[in-house]
Swiss-Prot record:
The atypical heteromeric and topological design of the odorant receptors appears to be an insect-specific solution for odor recognition, making the OR/Orco complex an attractive target for the development of highly selective insect repellents to disrupt olfactory-mediated host-seeking behaviors of insect disease vectors. Odor-evoked OR currents are independent of known G-protein-coupled second messenger pathways. Odorant receptor which mediates acceptance or avoidance behavior, depending on its substrates. The odorant receptor repertoire encodes a large collection of odor stimuli that vary widely in identity, intensity, and duration. May form a complex with Orco to form odorant-sensing units, providing sensitive and prolonged odorant signaling and calcium permeability. Involved in the behavioral responses to butanal, heptanal, and 2-heptanone. This is Odorant receptor 1a. Keywords: Cell membrane, Membrane, Olfaction, Receptor, Sensory transduction, Transducer, Transmembrane, Transmembrane helix. It is a multi-pass membrane protein. InterPro entries: 7tm6_olfct_rcpt (IPR004117). Its main location: membrane. It comes from the Eukaryota.
């Protein structure tokens, strides 16, 4: 049993598992092609795109009903998010695979930080598995709750009347049992795509943020050994190794920022609408409301937001901690003034590059406040419109 748990908590196990369910390989061969099964991936994308079109058609038909439109908007935005994130992931797959290798490479040695990396990585995989269970619970409750209610109604009344909380305008009649079964099969692909794409991409971002943070800690461990090897007689004062490692780490941060910038931007923009739609479902309830799905989905959206914002915040804090340690450890009083400026100015300027962004957004705690305020403003507006036009 312990061996099985150790496998599940292995490096990138959750990410590799979820990407494999979509026909992708996160650790490809030398050719670097991550798309292992194009047919499976295309089926998932096509079924999701089809359901997105039916959601848009429903919103157009019911554009005067705020509650129904907000629920359809919630489903539509999540499908748009999944499609965009996976499209960006495929477009930048080579960069992401290279980023994974760069983050892993310093932790191969059997040192203290390598041991900490394995420990933190196992903890991260445990959190990723919990997040996967949240996404799976969202998908399962979304499909099984309406099916169970439909079967219960059929058993009690003998009438086949499908119950659904998915607001779509389908081009076929789901009141026929065989058509309803086919529609459920389509939804299996859609919900699997949502679950795996959300878990895979989001937890991969969290894994990269964890790796970069631990590399800063590793650099800090090297910095603490500086007093013993500081040599004023050398032209580089014995500090060249630290500066080389710091420059390499800054390149990794820049690579990390470049690889995930578009994905993070999609998350920030779409999550405001998602929060607004989710809140509206709680404050403006209606018939056939799937509260099990809403509960799981609320957890997923909140965790999703925390992964991106607090992950970026952790990288920034580790960089600041390294800067403070740099000033504390290096004997600046033994350096000539011109060398102090030569060392300090580039390092101070380089620290600004550790702020992870999403185009014109800077990921961190201030952005979290902005997202909640924006979602709250949209919710207040929709609630006012609902009270004015639909409660009288």
């Amino acid at each position: 049993m312990s061996k099985l748990i150790e496998v599940f908590l292995g490096n990138l196990w959750t990410q590799r598992f979820t990407f494999a369910r979509m026909g992708l390989d996160l650790q490809p061969d030398k050719k670097g092609n991550v798309l292992r099964s194009p047919l499976l991936y295309c089926i998932m994308c096509l079924t999701t795109s089809f359901e997105l079109c039916t959601v848009c058609a429903f919103m157009v038909q019911n554009r005067n009903q705020i509650v129904l439109c907000s629920e359809a908007l919630m489903h539509g935005l999540q499908m748009v998010s999944s499609l965009l994130k996976m499209a960006i992931f495929l477009a930048k797959s080579h960069d992401l695979v290279d980023l994974i290798q760069q983050i892993q490479s310093p932790f191969t040695e059997e040192d203290l930080v390598g041991t900490e990396w394995r420990s933190q990585n196992q903890r991260g995989q445990l959190m990723a598995a919990i997040y996967f269970m949240m996404c799976a619970g969202t998908s399962v409750s979304f499909l099984l709750m309406p099916v169970a209610l439909t079967m219960l109604k059929y058993h009690s009344t003998g009438e086949f009347a499908p119950v659904s909380s998915f607001r779509v305008l389908l081009p076929y009649d789901v009141t026929q049992p065989h058509v309803y079964a086919m529609d459920c099969c389509l939804m299996v692909f859609v919900l699997s795509f949502f679950c795996c794409s959300t878990t895979g991409v989001d937890t991969l971002y969290g894994w990269c943020a964890l790796g970069v943070s631990l590399q800063y800690r590793r650099l800090g461990q090297q910095l603490k050994r500086i007093p013993s090897c500081f040599n004023p007689s050398r032209s580089d004062f014995g500090l060249s190794g630290i500066f080389v490692e710091h420059a390499r780490l800054l390149k990794i941060v820049q690579h990390f920022n470049y690889s995930f910038m578009e994905i993070a931007f999609v998350e920030v923009v779409i999550i405001c609408g998602l929060y607004c739609s989710v809140i509206c479902q709680y404050i403006m309830p209606h018939t056939n409301q799937n509260f099990a799905f809403l509960g799981f989905f609320s957890l997923v959206v909140t965790t999703q937001l925390c992964i991106y914002l607090f992950g970026a915040e952790q990288v920034r804090l580790e960089a600041e901690r390294f800067s403070r340690l740099l000033y504390e450890v290096i004997p600046w009083q033994n350096l000539p003034p011109k060398h102090r400026k030569l060392f300090l100015f580039p390092i101070e300027r380089a620290q600004r590059e550790t702020v992870l962004g999403a185009y014109f957004f800077e990921l961190g705690r201030p952005l979290l406040v902005w997202i909640f305020r924006t979602a709250g403003s949209f919710t207040t507006l929709m609630n006012a419109l609902y009270a004015k036009y639909e409660t009288h």
